[in-house]
Regions:
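Short helix-capping segments at alpha-helix termini
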Residues: 2-4, 27-32
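Extended hydrophobic secondary-structure segments that form protein cores and membrane-embedded regions
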Residues: 8-13, 63-69
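Short beta-strand/loop segment that forms part of the nucleotide-sugar
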Residues: 5-16, 36-38
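Hydrophobic helical membrane-anchoring modules
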Residues: 26, 152-202
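A conserved acidic beta->alpha catalytic loop
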Residues: 13-21, 40, 71-72
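Acceptor/aglycone-binding surface of glycosyltransferases and processive sugar-polymer synthases
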Residues: 39-40, 44-54, 63-66, 75-149, ...
Length: 202
């Protein structure tokens, strides 16, 4: 609410067959809603990369805000991105997780994952997909092949000077969180692969 900006939504459907409620409250700020259907679910990174490619090639925009549509990325935090983007129109912004909704054991494992990522790559990555990307950054991301396998790793690789804003992980609208220990391990390895040359040197 109360956003003096033109916002368009592009939904990338990752081949989901789950039924959704097609009522949309509080859409007075929304200029358009478009759904792009993927033929098969190829994972978060490829889904986001496909969305970025589609928007870059077919839309006019100043910023793109990739986010999960399951509630874990809270829509109310979009205003924080917009306010911060006014300060610098060329820098991209990341939502740094300050609070997670999973159990204690998973939170400990997640902190360990962040420590190992820093130890192996020399990069501190405290963000996920929920970001606000400038047009310049989107172009850089699409030129980086690793974007199709690791969004956060590739963003950290192509942009060293990122702004940040606190982000609280929300609760899913439907069902439990999909981030299992196995998925966390895959996430860690995908980031490591982005910086594999650095890892070998270290």
């Amino acid at each position: 609410k109360d956003l003096n900006h033109e916002i368009s939504i592009v939904v990338i459907n990752d081949a989901s067959s789950q039924q959704i409620v097609d009522t949309y409250p509080n859409i007075e700020n929304i200029n358009s809603i478009e759904i792009v259907n993927m033929k098969e679910n190829r994972g978060h990174a490829r889904c986001i990369a496909s969305g970025l490619k589609y928007i870059f090639e077919k839309k006019e925009f100043d910023f793109v805000i990739p986010m999960d549509g399951d509630g874990e990325d809270r829509p109310e935090e979009i205003k924080n991105f917009i306010e911060l983007s006014k300060q610098n129109s060329e820098k991209s912004i990341v939502g740094e997780r300050v609070k997670r909704s999973e159990g204690l054991i998973f939170k400990v494992c997640y902190q360990f994952h962040k420590f190992l990522t820093l130890a192996f790559t020399g990069k501190s990555i405290k963000f996920g997909n929920f970001t606000c990307l400038s047009k310049i950054t989107v172009k850089k991301m699409l030129e980086e092949k690793a974007t199709w396998s690791s969004f956060s790793g590739s963003l950290k690789k192509v942009e060293n000077d990122l702004l940040s804003t606190p982000s609280i992980r929300g609760k899913r609208y439907v069902g439990p969180s999909q981030m299992s220990f196995f998925n966390l391990l895959k996430h860690f390895l995908s980031i490591i692969s982005v910086f594999r040359k650095t890892v070998l040197i270290r």
